[in-house]
UniProtKB/Swiss-Prot annotation:
Pfam families per UniProt: ACP
Full protein name: Citrate lyase acyl carrier protein
Subcellular localization, as worded in the UniProt entry: Cytoplasm
Source species of the chain: Treponema denticola (strain ATCC 35405 / DSM 14222 / CIP 103919 / JCM 8153 / KCTC 15104)
A GO term from the CC aspect: cytoplasm
Subunit composition and interactions: Oligomer with a subunit composition of (alpha,beta,gamma)6.
Gene: citD
UniProt keyword terms in alphabetical order: Cytoplasm, Phosphoprotein
Length: 87
C-alpha cells in the first residue's frame, strides 16, 4: 500500500490511542505509551502485523497510546492506513 497523504485516527482518552501516519521514504515508528515499559514490544508487534498485512513499506507512524488493547491498536492503525490511501 502506498501512503498518499497524512491521516489520523483515534483519541487521547484512556484505553485508546492516537495514530498519525505520514508519507516517508522508509518505515518508521515513533511510539509513546503510558505502558511502554510493560507492553512496548507487544504494541510494536501488533502495529507491524497490520503494516505487513497491508504491505506498507514507506511511512512514518506516530502513535500515542493510553493503554489501548491490541484490537483497538489494530483498528486505529488500519483505519489510519485506509484514510492515508484515499484520494
Amino acid at each position: 500500500m502506498q501512503i498518499k497523504r497524512e491521516a489520523v485516527c483515534g483519541t487521547l482518552q484512556s484505553n485508546d490511542c492516537l495514530v498519525r501516519i505520514v508519507p516517508s521514504e522508509k518505515l518508521e515508528l515513533d511510539l509513546k505509551s503510558s505502558v511502554l515499559n510493560e507492553f512496548g514490544a507487544q504494541i510494536k508487534k501488533t502495529v507491524q502485523e497490520v503494516l505487513d498485512e497491508f504491505e506498507v513499506k514507506n511511512a512514518k507512524l506516530f502513535i500515542e497510546d493510553k493503554g489501548a488493547l491490541d484490537c483497538t491498536i489494530k483498528a486505529r492503525v488500519e483505519t489510519a492506513l485506509r484514510r492515508a490511501n484515499e484520494k
